[in-house]
Amino acid sequence: MKLAVLYAGQGAQHPGMGREFYEDFSAFRAAFDSAALEFDLHRVCFEDPDGVLNQTEYTQPCMVAFACGVSAVLAEKGVQPSYVAGLSLGEYSALEAAGVFTAKQAIELAAYRGKAMADAAKGIDCGMTAVLNLDRDALAVCCEEASALGCVQICNYNCPGQLVIGGEKAAVDKAAELAKAAGARRCIPLKGSGPFHTRLMAPAGDALAKRFETEAFGEMQVPVLFNCLGREMPDGSSIPALLVKQVQSSVYMEDTLRRLGQLGVDHILEVGPGNALSGFVKKTLPGVVCASVETPAQLDAVLTAWKEEQ
């Protein structure tokens, strides 16, 4: 079995995520509790009485804290991936799993990134729209034509038949209109999203670059496939530079998955919450065994089933 672990990005968060892992595993608790944040992580992640979990400055550290905790449990159970990757924010979780960041670092960096992205989006009438069943080159032409109305770019290449555009709302709406005329099956506006992974996030990239100057990066123990490349990091590349680029550049998840297939990966474990990445895997690599994990029961079931395969 050649295993890759994928880490979810924001969007599938919900109150209560991670509570069962927290109750059952000291390794999860140690990772989850390692960061010093300006808010009560337990209160927001497990209960969210104030309804702030969907605000990106809260979403990001909560998602990464969950992922780091699950990674600690996976390590405790002897799960050793050959490769790791993540969708957008999930790249920070992947880097923690690979040994580049400590759990404390990853969670605190996610909080910083979330605030920087929220700040960059302030005052912009922005949006993101999923575009179904249109070729990426055709959609790029639509975005170029609509850019007369403002910034609009393809921000996510998720899987065959699913792309996401983002930027300033007028331009995004125009690009979606052109996409439908060009043959897109559906265009679905995404609620509560900023212009993530577009050039409008340049201020967030600048903020991250400054923060990374004070961070120590560990040695990568597991190969990471990077969002802005769709593959492993070339020799001579800089992880901080790739993360600065990532926040303001397209996420090449379909390319990442195809690369995992080329590398011989035959099993993929998605660390949720949610199972969006598993859906992308099934459309991109239909021959690969894939499962998503959000609870201890799900993890036990997956590991038992995979052990019986061998």
Please state what every model-predicted region is.
Residues Y252-M253:
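Amphipathic coiled-coil/heptad-repeat helices and related helical stalk/stem segments
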Residues P189-G192, G261, E294:
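Short glycine-rich catalytic loops that host catalytic nucleophiles or stabilize transition states
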Residues L229, V289-Q310:
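Short, flexible loop segments at boundaries between secondary-structure elements
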Residues Q10-A12, L37-H42, A98-Q248:
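Alpha/beta catalytic cores of group-transfer enzymes, especially the acyltransferase/condensing modules
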Residues A75, K180, R258-G264:
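Non-catalytic positions within long, well-ordered alpha-helices that form the structural scaffold/packing
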Residues M1-L139, H267-A297:
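FabD-like malonyl-/acyl-CoA
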